[in-house]
Amino acid sequence: GGQGAVGGDRGWLLGNGGAGGDGGAGGEGGDSSGGAASAGGDGGAGGAGGAGANGGLLIGHGGAGGGGTGGNGHGRPIGSGGAGGDGGDGGTGGWLYGNGGHGGTGATGGSGRHSGASGDGGDGGDAQAIGDGGAGGSGGLLFGAPGAHG
């Protein structure tokens, strides 16, 4: 899957950063074309979430990071699931005031003969002068470390 887009720009002095886009889903594995002994295709890996944009230079909250998904295996015997994408990092708060953005959640890996590994959560964004750091995104349901707290 493709990488998620970075969050949209904010106003130069004031304004909140946009959230990062979610990573594209990994491709689904193809069905086996031969007999039952032919393995099905594996799912593609999910794309990583985009980073949240930073808050305005003076005042503004950082945007949250996006997440991704993993593709599922198919066929007989079934293929393995693709890895889940990592969560994007949260954006930084404004220089005077603003909270850091939350880190994106890592995606659960796709299902199949072997489940795909889950992605890691993104790091929380930092506050600079006044504001709370963003909490790290959680890891995937099966595997994946949570992101660091801002």
Located regions from the model:
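Long, compositionally biased tandem-repeat segments
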Residues: 1-150
